[in-house]
Amino acid sequence: LNDNPSLAADSPSLFTQTAIDNYRRAKGDNSDGLGYNWDYFDYAFQPSVLQDYSLSVRGGTDRARYFILGSYYKQGGNYKHSNSDNANNFLRYNFRANVDVDATKRLKISVDLGARVTEYTYPGATAANIISLANTQPPYLPIVLPNNGNEVNQGDFEENGGYLLYADNDYRYNMLGQLSRSGFSKRTRRYLQGSFKLSHDLDFITEGLSIAAQFSYDTFNQHTINNSVPTHSTGNLTYPGYSTWMLPEEYSIDEWKNNSAYWIQNGSYVTANQRTTDDAQGNSLSHANPEGTSRFQARLDYARKFGDHNVTAMVLYYMQNKIVGKEVPYRYMGFSGRATYDYKNKYLFEFNIGYNGSENFARGHRFGVFPAGSIGWVVSQEEFMKNVRWIDHLKLRASYGLVGNDQIC
């Protein structure tokens, strides 16, 4: 059906046979700049290249061990025609170091350090905008207007890198402009993690008894450099900040497509968004609220076997303090206990209790008691199940407990 949707409903004008033949040309043959049959997804997107490098070293002695890791990761962008690869990519740098030392026969010390930096650079135009443009822009519209030698526009060509981007009153954005002349933004995130742990066997008191304590601290900060070209609005219409050009209003793009007479006759171009050059890129720096989280826990563990009887117990203290910018600190504190018993790994009993608090609640209502218990029976350990070859493990378990949530106030 020869139907030109950009014409009025009562217009008898259709695409000429020349325009139809041009539209049928092989994809990618747009060397004269007239477009005809753009595949915008092919024009705008490309497969990305991933690079991942890492170097690790480990070693030590009977009493001390270490591990060091450094890595570099780069993912190229999926956009073609961006200003450079550095304006369309993702970078990540990782570092980790772990050291474990047996200070004495019973005392062990562990130090873990980790750091990560990520950099994400992207065009000023959003991915949603670029994908929407690829889906909706008519494929017969030109992307770049050819330099037809008209003296009126020679200065404009020089000021715009030797080419003019096409747009009109109906299609105000240009794919090449969105990719290469909308500016860019760069978001950098930094993470730092560290922990220090001590553990000590207390078997000189009783067999199976041990104690451990750990302190950790994590930090995070983020800043974004915004060098994107701002858009501007006229009435209820939004225009890009880069300059776009079109034919004078007395000409239509359909005449362009049907006979190309206008550019052959050296006609002049006029601005489509009242800009002869691109607006200046933005130059702003924004910071996310820095975050710092400290955690401390201490625990006493007991595990021992008495013939066919297995007994374990644990008492834990936990504290967390999180600071986000100038906000009120988020604090959590709690004590937990657990005791387990089993007979021949067949009959299982467990009891847990927690006494936990959060600063989200008012004074006098910050702590709660949360008990839980369970019983279990490993049926497959019974003598009458030994000859049932199609069942390796069968356990029945029932449990009941109370839990808390501090995100309800």
Feature map (PLM): residue ranges:
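Flexible glycine-rich, low-complexity coil/linker segments exposed to the extracellular/periplasmic environment
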Residues: 1-39, 138-178, 229-230, 237-290
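Flexible loop and strand-edge segments within Gram-negative outer membrane beta-barrel domains
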Residues: 31-71, 75-82, 86-172, 185-189, ...
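Transmembrane beta-barrel architecture of outer-membrane proteins
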Residues: 50-54, 90-94, 189-195, 293-297, ...
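Residues on the lipid-exposed face of transmembrane beta-strands in outer-membrane beta-barrel proteins
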Residues: 53-61, 97-101, 194-200, 298-302, ...
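Short loop/turn motifs that connect adjacent beta-strands in outer-membrane beta-barrel proteins
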Residues: 62-63, 106, 188, 201-211, ...
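Transmembrane beta-strands of outer-membrane beta-barrel proteins
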Residues: 66-68, 109-111, 209-215, 311-315, ...
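Solvent-exposed loop/turn elements at secondary-structure boundaries
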Residues: 168, 386-409
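Signature of Gram-negative outer-membrane beta-barrel scaffolds
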Residues: 219, 317-372, 387-391
